[in-house]
């Protein structure tokens, strides 16, 4: 394990993707030859923000964790920087599983995927294709990437203008033209690109804490990120998910990924499946605050139940 002033419970690792990028993360080793989870954060968020607390709980319960930054942001390679590419992030999950299966002390037949918000959906999307995956934990997943309808025509026009500018720069001889970056959220708590999953003045006010916690966090994305989000329908292949067990943790007052969309999606899943429902929690309230301990207990129990063959199709929690 690495030491830096205080003892850390993880080692720093890197692994290659199929297209040659180095993705970087943390490996929290749990029980020898035991189960493991691949974890990634949500939209443009880096691995240092909040979810290390969850990784440490899994580790203390014998579950190893590979927590990594997807391509294009954080400590991982990939260009353009700050371009969120959810389809490629699904592939990053594939390659993270390949890496984790090769690590000593990991049971290669007991690896699950974990995601929250945007990555909660990409984890499901990855598991639809990758049958090496033993289970999925999806925390308040973004079921559909929606935009403010009145802004969509302007967003589409900005996307095309950006492509024109990048082509013009390459025509003029630039090898790596710099893309236009836009803030994730403005001072009044609205995405300048009308992306519904990023909103709320509280979210804007938390940005300094994010940057203090993770100096490599950048509170902006490329314009073309939103082209990729407009085209993204991550859960169109859910018919392929079964028989991989999934646990969804759903807040009853989700102000980012509408609660009813999550509930409807859960009901449509072919199973096996388990739901934990938290009536009084919002999107950011499951991994922060007083609910955290119970939320983590439910996730640890799910992993243990799946591996022990005790998995029930559905349970509830408040």
Curated annotation (Swiss-Prot):
Gene that specifies this protein: aneE
Disruption phenotype annotation: Abolishes the production of aculenes A and B and accumulates aculenes C and D.
Molecular function in Gene Ontology: hydrolase activity
Described function: Thiohydrolase; part of the gene cluster that mediates the biosynthesis of aculenes, a unique type of norsesquiterpenes that contain a nordaucane skeleton linked to an L-proline moiety and are of mixed biosynthetic origin. The pathway begins with the synthesis of dauca-4,7-diene by the terpene cyclase aneC using farnesyl pyrophosphate (FPP) as substrate.
Name recorded for this polypeptide: Thiohydrolase aneE
Catalysed conversion reaction: aculene D + L-prolyl-[peptidyl-carrier protein] = aculene B + holo-[peptidyl-carrier protein]; aculene C + L-prolyl-[peptidyl-carrier protein] = aculene A + holo-[peptidyl-carrier protein]
Disulfide bonds: none
Xref: Pfam families: Hydrolase_4 (PF12146)
Enzyme class: hydrolase
Entry's EC annotation: 3.1.-.-
Family according to the record: Belongs to the polyketide transferase af380 family.
Keywords: Hydrolase
């Amino acid at each position: 394990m690495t030491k830096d002033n205080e003892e850390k419970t993880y080692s720093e690792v890197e692994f290659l993707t199929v297209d040659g990028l180095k993705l970087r993360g943390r490996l929290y080793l749990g029980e020898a030859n035991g189960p493991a989870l691949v974890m990634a954060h949500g939209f443009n968020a880096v691995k240092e923000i909040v979810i290390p607390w969850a990784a440490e709980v899994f580790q203390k319960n014998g579950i190893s964790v590979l927590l990594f930054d997807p391509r294009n942001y954080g400590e991982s390679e990939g260009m353009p920087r700050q371009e969120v590419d959810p389809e490629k992030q699904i592939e990053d999950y594939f390659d993270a599983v390949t890496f984790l299966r090769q690590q000593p002390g990991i049971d290669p037949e007991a690896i699950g995927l974990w995601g929250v918000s945007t990555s909660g959906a990409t984890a499901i999307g990855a598991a639809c294709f990758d049958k090496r995956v033993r289970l999925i934990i999806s925390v308040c997943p973004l079921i559909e990437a929606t935009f403010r309808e009145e802004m969509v025509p302007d967003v589409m026009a900005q996307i095309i203008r950006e492509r024109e500018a990048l082509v013009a720069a390459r025509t003029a001889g630039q090898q790596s033209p710099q893309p236009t970056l836009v803030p994730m959220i403005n001072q009044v708590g609205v995405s300048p690109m009308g992306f519904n999953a990023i909103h709320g003045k509280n979210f804007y006010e938390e940005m300094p804490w994010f940057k203090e916690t993770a100096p490599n966090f950048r509170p902006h994305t490329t314009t073309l990120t939103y082209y990729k989000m407009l085209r993204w329908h991550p859960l169109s292949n859910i018919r392929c998910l079964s028989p991989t067990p999934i646990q969804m943790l759903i807040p009853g007052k989700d102000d980012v990924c509408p609660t009813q969309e999550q509930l409807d999606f859960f009901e449509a899943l072919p199973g096996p499946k388990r739901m934990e429902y938290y009536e009084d929690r919002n999107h950011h309230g499951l991994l922060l605050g007083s609910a955290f301990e119970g939320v983590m207990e439910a996730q640890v129990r799910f992993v243990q139940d799946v591996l022990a063959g005790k998995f029930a199709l559905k349970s509830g929690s408040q």
